[in-house]
Amino acid sequence: MSTSAAPPIDRQRIRELIKREERVLNERTGRSAEMFKRANRSLSGGVASSYQLRDPWPIYLERGDGPVVWDVDGNQMWDFHNGFGSMVQGHAHPVIGKAIQERYAKGTHFAAPTEDAIAVGEELARRWGLPQWRYTNSGSESTMDAIRIARAFTGRDTVMKIFGSYHGHHDTVMVSIGVEYDKIGEPDDLASLPYGAGIPQATVDMTVAVPFNDVGAMERRLEKLIAQDRKPACVIMEAAMMNLGVVLPEDGYLQAVRDLTAKHGIVLIFDEVKTGLCIAAGGATEKWGVTPDMVTLAKALGAGLPMGAIGGTEEVMSVVKNGSVYQVGTYNGNPLGVAATRASLIEVLTPDAYAHLDALNDRIVGACDMVIQKYGLPGYAVGVGSKGCVTFSPTKITDYASFKANQDAELSDLAWLFNMNRGIFMTPGREEEWTLSVTHSEEAVDAYVEVFDELASDLMS
């Protein structure tokens, strides 16, 4: 990764290209427009989740196979979206399909434990080095339950998180996510602000945010909270921020956080909903060699089925084992979900698969950096495992404040449109990253780079 000292870009040129590409995309997605009208009659906003929205209409998909998806207009695209990072196995993987079919014939739901659930727990314990596990059905459920367990274990209420990080849609963590730059606050006293309506102020006040990559600011905020008799129950964080593109931890940062939380008896939770099974076999915990007290998983865990998990130490998870905390859910450990997960862990996400993902990501990141240098674009490419992005910023992004101060939102919008119009399906947000799957090839990543080169050439001509 290298940042580029680039000349200013013609802003008018960016806006002209955005308008051109918007017209092209609208012309290519007429059936999506029609489907949006129909969907609005029964689905609020025309979609199943607010994160599926885009203006003037969402792109409705019809099917996927391996690294490729087709929308309802028949447009074929390389899938770099991969279900917000859930499909690192690729679409319709035959191993996963076989496991689901075999399980379906034996029954799909009992609300009772199965042998597959045990096997998955054993494999997760091996990969993460955390002995005790429970299941959920989503990332939001995983982080919600993990925080409840941490509160029960410590007897404390306050939660500390990283400013700008997303940890699901439950009230405790819907705080200090998308905030305008002038409302962020100072590093040692960042604001606690609700992410949307309907979140009680009392809940907001119990969640305290600190900047990423700044253990000094975290320590100073902790000292203030302790002086106020508000020592946190937990620190919940992504080891690498995955909703500002990709922001990697600085050397020594994660270990310093581990040491600080251990010193104060605060439960450290790594939210690996996005990184888990995507950047290494044991996620960020393996990648950077720092073991937290708890880990939360979802997304790629279920290989396309709704599946989440919480892992923890014997000590922390004892409050679940002894019945102090009711960690429950009718569909927790659903037979279809654990069957798909078991097949994925044992037969698909193998050491060879991770070597393949690492090689592909090195290829795409290196090639994108070459394009940036060739055309003098303001930005850099960064990636880890199956995850990566081009960050349009004249300086390196290290936290939310530097992201809001420097990210070129218009250029990010233009890049998304360019990709969509040239067969690259990407996530619909300025803050998202690509996710490769084990079925992606050099042809797929080279196609991404080719489109990026065309964008740079068109922009700088």
What label would you give each PLM region?
Residues 2-461:
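Conserved N-terminal phosphate-binding loop of PLP-dependent enzymes in the Aspartate aminotransferase
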